[in-house]
């Protein structure tokens, strides 16, 4: 079904005062959750004391198993360790509380019919955020309209939003950073999607598409290769991973100011 801009404008449904208030509250809590995740990421891993040649050293360990000495035991390194564990504990508690609060907000959203983005889309974007790779992707196409209706406090007619796929535009200029991030996680794009829904599979006839058992598709698209862009482009070293499909509108998408809500 196609709609003209005028038709859409005349068919828009304004949210009620209670819906608008709930939408703002939910947005505020989710923003705080993203900040809490970032804070928790800074203090991932741990610190340990290790004896080397008769002296104790403070060692910073990462989740990947890397270790770095912060120096021999002293009042300074003891303070560093104490501050680290205090910060880690506070970050974990804040993350726990906000995660619980987001669940409450999701229930209220459903009760008031606010925040109607399909769950599979929300969970996919959350998976990218948790993996630290969300910054490399931009939602384009029909599902991007949800951000606009949220900002405007209106609802777009369901007929204009009916689609069974979401397009994720990948900025190839940030390719190295994405590949490094996935490498550190020992993961791939299809593996991230399978954390959302284990039935996601790469479609053999179109390697840029992942489809789940319900028929919902996630498409990875990119600009037409130029300026040394890698092509063809697989999203990770995994031979069974998704590939990015070139779209002629890619440069226009990159040149446009992204909308954030």
Residue spans for each PLM region:
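Compositionally biased terminal segments of proteins
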Residues: 1-56, 62-64, 69-261
């Amino acid at each position: 079904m196609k709609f003209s801009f005028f038709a859409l404008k005349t068919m828009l449904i304004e949210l009620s005062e209670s819906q608008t208030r709930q939408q703002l509250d939910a947005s505020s809590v989710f923003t705080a959750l993203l900040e809490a995740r970032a804070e928790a990421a800074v203090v991932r891993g741990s610190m340990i004391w290790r004896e080397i040649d008769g002296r104790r050293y403070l060692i910073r360990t990462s989740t990947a198993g890397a270790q770095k000495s912060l120096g021999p035991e002293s009042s300074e390194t003891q303070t560093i360790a104490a501050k680290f564990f205090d910060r880690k504990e506070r970050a974990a508690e804040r993350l726990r509380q906000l995660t619980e609060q987001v669940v409450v907000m999701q229930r209220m959203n459903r009760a008031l019919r606010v925040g109607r983005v399909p769950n599979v889309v929300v969970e996919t974007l959350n998976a990218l955020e948790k993996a630290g790779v969300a910054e490399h992707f931009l939602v384009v196409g029909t599902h991007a309209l949800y951000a606009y209706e949220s900002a405007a406090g209106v609802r777009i007619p369901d007929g204009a939003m009916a689609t069974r796929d979401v397009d994720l535009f990948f900025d190839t200029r940030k390719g190295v950073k994405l590949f490094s991030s996935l490498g550190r996680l020992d993961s791939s794009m299809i593996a991230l999607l399978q954390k959302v829904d284990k039935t996601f599979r790469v479609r053999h006839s179109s390697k840029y598409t992942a489809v789940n058992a319900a028929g919902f598709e996630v498409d990875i698209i990119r600009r037409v290769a130029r300026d040394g862009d890698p092509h063809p482009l697989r999203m990770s070293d995994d031979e069974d991973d998704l590939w990015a499909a070139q779209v002629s509108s890619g440069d226009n998408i990159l040149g446009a100011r992204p909308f954030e809500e």
